[in-house]
Amino acid sequence: MDNITINNRSQIVIQEDTGNQSYVAKIWLYDITADQLTEVAHHDQDRFAPGAPNFLTQDEESSGVIDASAILGEGWYLLDQQAHYATDAELVEGGQLLALHIPPGKKLQVR
């Protein structure tokens, strides 16, 4: 586990950094009250699992998650996805900025 943020519903959003391992990184939601950990997102296995058809790298992570509820509405988060592979000199490496919605008040399925 790497980066976290806490929302106003006693839940922690947790991001994984796999550290250049073949395991595809995930994003988790930990509900403090229910003591329940649920996977809410994962990186694209077609791009980050070794041997996949569109493989880029196994060195991926998401980072910098912030609760954006005050700006985008309840259940919205902003984060970045870092794909540690070489690209053109202007960009340095792959990645993107993401908006993630975790619906509030909805029972999440445990995976």
What are the residue ranges of the model-derived segments?
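Sequence/structural signature of beta-propeller domains
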Residues: M1-R111
